[in-house]
Amino acid sequence: MSEQKQDVAATEEQQPVLQIQRIYVKDVSFEAPNLPHIFQQEWKPKLGFDLSTETTQVGDNLYEVVLNISVETTLEDSGDVAFICEVKQAGVFTISGLEDVQMAHCLTSQCPNMLFPYARELVSNLVNRGTFPALNLSPVNFDALFVEYMNRQQAENAEEKSEEEQTKH
């Protein structure tokens, strides 16, 4: 009986763990520098969108992940800035039982994927409060971004290795 309990405990220790501890807004900014005259122009927006993540280990198996979203909208004809919206949506996650690549995937894909709906809603709300037309950000495929990042890393490593071999000869 006690052997079964030990086996179960050992199995539970080996299981990957990903738990949300807290989700919060770390920083938010909304600027509409050309109000009110921007509303007198024809609304032909040009949208600029930037996305990045930051990860910090804050304790044993405890990580803060910050999803940074920046949206800048200008008018096509005049080039005037309609609005700039910046959101840092953050979360603290308990993560354990993962190897290096799995951990990197979790921190740069799974965690941001959980944070994105909160950030998207906040951006939409801020734009709405500025009385601009609705802005609904499309979903982001963080898995594809992670694969792209890993491929770039492998290509850079192969290039560095090739350069090292050429300098040795």
From Swiss-Prot:
InterPro entries: SecB, SecB-like_sf. GO terms for biological process: protein folding; protein tetramerization; protein transport. GO terms for cellular component: cytoplasm. Disulfide bonds: none annotated. One of its GO terms (molecular function) is unfolded protein binding. Keywords: Chaperone, Cytoplasm, Protein transport, Translocation, Transport. It is found in: Cytoplasm. Its main location: cytoplasm. It comes from the Bacteria. Pfam families: SecB (PF02556). PANTHER family: PROTEIN-EXPORT PROTEIN SECB, PTHR36918. One of the proteins required for the normal export of preproteins out of the cell cytoplasm. It is a molecular chaperone that binds to a subset of precursor proteins, maintaining them in a translocation-competent state. It also specifically binds to its receptor SecA. Homotetramer, a dimer of dimers. One homotetramer interacts with 1 SecA dimer. Belongs to the SecB family. This is Protein-export protein SecB. It comes from Haemophilus influenzae (strain PittEE).
